[in-house]
């Protein structure tokens, strides 16, 4: 008689749902434009060139042809939306100013195809987007007016928030996004963990946190793709993702502006937490487009516990933390 918890009984399309959220027509239009771009990105993933592009991004990483194409698809959509003034992409060296619309209401930071190196082995990848009011992109993530990711897996799904809860939409056979989960919420604590980075390079506090998770029976679930790993933690509502500081990379690997802020926004909206181990991710003031940051995000109690281990010296060399 009753549908599955968190599912919607009747099909609701994305534009209709956004209008029901009582947000501005311009923000509705922008989110729908990004969703529309994803249809072309998934087509490129399924049919496009998997080779290298012969170029590098601002981090010195070799760009794949799919990176470049996905970036172009999304940037063109944003550029012609009529509501965006500044665009920052992980694949671009500097902010792209929309000269045709310098008075645009929003600025957008995005990773066009996170995990693109996984495409050739047919693993899930995704697009990550953060939306800010006005022209300033170097502001704390807490100032975002919207965040979303699109997961290109066995199904294409979009998870978004405009500060009024977290919703999931799934692409149907007509390539339309329809509501599939409403008001996604995380449990206080979970039983899965997704740890990035080489374990032998973890600091002492992070190693103790891992042993704590193992002792309480948490299961390791890590694909190497940021979007699918966060999606698992968020949709299951019971886990923690981390990419910590490493001995040779004290600032971690993931980018604050393009990856961490949007995901932290979504996780907090679902009742979870996100920290660099010392302060909430969303309170960090970015100093540059390419700023990196350690990250712990997921169930609130687990994230708090991670910070405790990181900020509490070990009492004895061989002390095993208790769950």
UniProtKB/Swiss-Prot annotation:
UniProt-annotated binding residues for Mg(2+) 1: 90, 111, 113
Location in the cell: Cytoplasm
GO molecular function terms attached to this record: fructose 1,6-bisphosphate 1-phosphatase activity; magnesium ion binding
CDD domains, A to Z: FBPase
InterPro entries for this protein: FBPase_C_dom, FBPase_class-1, FBPase_N, FBPtase, Fructose_bisphosphatase_AS, SBPase
Listed name of the protein: Fructose-1,6-bisphosphatase class 1
Class of this enzyme: hydrolase
Binding, substrate: 114-117, 222, 253
């Amino acid at each position: 008689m009753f549908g599955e918890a968190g599912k919607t009984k009747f099909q609701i399309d994305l534009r209709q749902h956004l209008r029901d959220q009582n947000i501005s027509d311009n923000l509705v239009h922008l989110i729908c434009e990004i969703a529309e771009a994803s249809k072309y990105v998934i087509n490129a993933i399924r049919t496009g060139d998997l080779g290298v592009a012969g170029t590098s991004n601002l981090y010195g990483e070799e760009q794949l042809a799919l990176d470049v194409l996905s970036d172009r698809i999304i940037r063109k959509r944003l550029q012609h939306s009529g509501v965006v003034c500044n665009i920052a992409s992980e694949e671009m060296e500097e902010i792209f100013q929309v000269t045709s619309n310098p008075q645009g209401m929003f600025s957008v930071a995005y990773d066009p195809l996170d995990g693109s190196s996984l495409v050739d082995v047919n693993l899930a990848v995704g697009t990550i987007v953060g939306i800010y009011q006005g022209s300033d992109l170097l502001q704390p993530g807490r100032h975002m007016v919207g965040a979303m990711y699109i997961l290109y897996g066995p199904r294409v799904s979009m998870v978004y928030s405009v500060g009024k809860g977290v919703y999931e939409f799934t692409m149907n056979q007509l390539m339309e996004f329809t509501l599939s989960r409403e008001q996604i919420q995380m449990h206080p604590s979970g039983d899965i963990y997704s740890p990035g980075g080489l374990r032998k390079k973890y600091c002492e506090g992070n190693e103790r946190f891992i042993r704590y998770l193992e002792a309480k029976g948490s299961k390791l679930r890590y694909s190497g793709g940021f979007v699918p790993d966060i999606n698992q933690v968020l949709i299951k509502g019971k886990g923690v993702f981390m990419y910590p500081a490493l001995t040779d990379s004290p600032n971690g690997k993931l980018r604050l502006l393009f990856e961490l802020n949007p995901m932290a926004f979504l996780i907090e909206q679902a009742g979870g937490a996100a920290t660099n181990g010392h302060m909430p991710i969303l309170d960090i003031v970015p100093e540059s487009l390419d700023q990196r940051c350690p990250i712990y995000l997921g169930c609130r109690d687990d994230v708090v516990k991670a910070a405790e281990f990181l900020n509490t010296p070990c009492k004895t060399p061989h002390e095993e933390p208790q769950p």
